[in-house]
Regions:
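TPR-adjacent "capping" and linker segments in tetratricopeptide-repeat scaffold/adaptor proteins
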Residues: 16-34
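Amphipathic alpha-helical segments of tetratricopeptide repeats
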Residues: 56-60, 97-102, 137-144, 179-186
Length: 213
């Protein structure tokens, strides 16, 4: 079974049955995976409240593999977002990042995605100074993460411009988007959605700054 959330690439839930740094036990892993399957099923049916309920069951399964619990956190954050509970999104992302750091390497993709999510929601909630500090620390740590999935790196860097954009620091935001485009153009199809998103973001801040390329 596959999941895709706002935080990163598609992940196979079945692949997380028991591996990883914190393996957990088979019974807890089975319960967590069952809850995650139900969460995805309910979400696809538009039953967001039930999807969140099942996702939280998986996240709170303390003896399950930590990777599985972090995948559950990713889903729950999406369900909280769908319900407009942005404060809960930030809170859960911060909790999940701390949970992951107890068992996994600091550069583990799931931890980076949770830290990215926390900073993202701080920006959404208007806590821009804190978001800037969180993104700055995250970007610095990313430099020590060889082999990081490019999609995760791009998502984090793209999001890091949000607090600059939200506080009217158009040139700083534009610099982030330009650097991304310089790496992506020529490497991706013109119809690539990530490329188009970054272009749109750059156009938005240039327009706001009344500066046109």
């Amino acid at each position: 079974m596959l999941t895709a959330t706002m935080h990163g690439p598609i992940v196979s839930l079945d692949a997380l049955a028991g591996g990883g740094t914190h393996e957990g036990n088979n019974t807890s892993a089975t319960r967590a995976r069952s809850s995650l399957h139900e969460s995805v099923r309910c979400g696809a049916a538009g039953k967001v409240d039930k999807a969140l309920e099942h996702g939280l069951e998986a996240y709170r399964e303390e003896d399950a593999p930590v990777e599985l619990r972090l995948e559950a956190a990713k889903l729950c954050i999406d369900w909280y977002a769908a319900l407009g509970s942005y404060g809960q999104c930030r809170k859960l992302a911060a909790q999940a990042a701390r949970l992951g750091e107890r068992y996994l390497e600091r550069c583990h993709p799931l931890i980076l995605m949770m830290r990215n999510s926390e900073a993202y929601w701080l920006a959404i909630l208007g806590q821009h100074d804190m978001a800037i500090r969180k993104f700055s620390a995250l970007l610095a740590d990313m430099k020590h993460c060889p082999g990081l999935d490019p999609e995760i790196s791009i998502a984090i860097r793209n999001n890091s411009a949000m607090p600059w954009k939200h506080t009217g620091k158009w040139k700083k935001a534009a610099r982030v988007y330009r650097e991304l485009l310089s790496e992506m153009e020529g490497q991706r199809e013109e119809a690539d959605m990530t490329l188009l998103t970054v272009r749109d973001n750059l156009a938005e801040v240039l327009s706001a700054d009344r500066c046109y390329d």
